[in-house]
């Protein structure tokens, strides 16, 4: 799998090197083109170049090493980096805990995430990168307040009425918990913040006007953030 990924990256780099229209790109496109068509990308993704102590600090898991690669990409000039949770290990290792919810959290999900994420934030801080890096830990929904007692046992299912997310760096407030649910964690009781609000706030922190519109396929103006608004509660 890793060799195949490396081969794909190498072939993509060769294809980009042959691209004759690179000079006509905008500044942003040229920056992206340059990152992909030089050794910078492959060097940044080579997390094995890090000292063993650093790799172990992130955790010797796919997610941990992916967070380390993300930090290296940021250092190399990457402007947008996504780290997906790896789905392997105990019960496929995903957060989609329709069964064995608590066992999966305790034995795999929480230890691996806490290990890698806390190290990433500390590493970014120590390298002077956290203030200029917006870190968002996002999911499309939460889990049901009720625990399923069917034969599969102890599962929690999809729930979008209330769920939490974690943010760090990039001009955000630190050490703050915003909002409150009822005692069952089923509904928001105070300070609801929508996904569109998060998008608007992120654009604001990145220097974009959240009210910007882009043309849809028919040429009509489409708001980037819909009805989202910048939330001052999130700002540092």
Predicted segments — roles?
Residues 1-236:
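Ligand-binding pockets and gating/stacking loops
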């Amino acid at each position: 799998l890793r060799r195949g990924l490396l081969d794909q990256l190498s072939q993509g780099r060769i294809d980009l090197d042959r691209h004759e229209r690179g000079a006509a790109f905008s500044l942003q496109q040229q920056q992206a083109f340059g990152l992909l068509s030089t050794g910078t990308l492959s060097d940044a993704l080579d997390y094995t170049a890090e000292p063993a102590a650093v790799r172990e600090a992130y955790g010797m898991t796919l997610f941990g090493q992916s967070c380390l690669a993300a930090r290296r990409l940021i250092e190399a000039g990457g402007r947008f980096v996504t780290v997906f949770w790896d789905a392997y290990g105990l019960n496929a290792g995903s957060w989609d805990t329709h069964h064995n919810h608590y066992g999966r959290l305790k034995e795999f999900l929480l230890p691996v995430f806490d290990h890698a994420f806390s190290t990433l934030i500390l590493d970014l801080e120590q390298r002077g990168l956290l203030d200029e890096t917006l870190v968002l830990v996002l999911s499309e929904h939460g889990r049901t307040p009720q625990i399923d007692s069917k034969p599969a046992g102890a599962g929690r299912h999809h729930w979008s009425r209330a769920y939490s997310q974690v943010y760090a760096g990039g001009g955000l407030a630190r050490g703050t918990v915003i909002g409150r649910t009822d005692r069952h964690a089923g509904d928001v009781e105070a300070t609801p913040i929508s996904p569109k609000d998060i998008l608007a706030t992120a654009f604001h922190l990145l220097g974009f006007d959240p009210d910007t519109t882009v043309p849809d396929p028919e040429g009509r103006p489409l708001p980037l953030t819909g009805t989202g608004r910048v939330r001052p509660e999130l700002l540092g």
